[in-house]
Amino acid sequence: IYVMDEANVETCGADAELSNNELWLFAQMERVAGMVKRDKNHPSIIFWSLGNESGVGANNAARASWVKDYDPTRLVHFEAYMHNGGSRQYGYGIDFMKTNRPAVNPPEPPAVDVVSTMYPSVEGIIKLATQEGETRPVLMCEYAHAKGNALGNHQEYWNAVKKYPRLIGGYIWDWVDQSVIRKDSVTGKEYFSSLNGTNGLVFADRKIKPAINECK
């Protein structure tokens, strides 16, 4: 199995406020460096991720630089660099698939080795894969949200992946339902309790769902 090891750095909802604040640099660097030092000898890890949904800022560039210096053998990934590097906003309000500007920002820092995006349309990943002047691989770091009766158009994504060489696939959100075992107060029967967490390819007890057959 190929693994992208991702640091425990996320500021979802705060945009890039922490990534542009030098007071948070040490804490963010500590998490990234700790991950790389801990896992560097695992052969299944083929690239590092600086974190998830934490905006663009100087702290990210510093962390990417450290990782590349410490381990030049692996790629560095960070999805937030898809967004405007000159803006403190994370960029979810901009539907770049419906604009005339390049899918990847021209001023994007050369800190990352992978073009990455979340929940794109099929047309969106084709646009990324065919952008003139761009040669890096394209990854869907989150896609095909497997909630309920999902993955209905999964084949369309993989038709594109197989057609365009720069598309390298993606990570489905997510693998297993997020649940805890509870007992019914009346019958005493155990059941899996989940509040809006039934978004796995398999149930909490690892029994398969139809969605995983679609993946196969």
Map each language-model feature to its residues:
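Extended substrate-binding grooves/exosites of carbohydrate-active enzymes
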Residues: 1-216
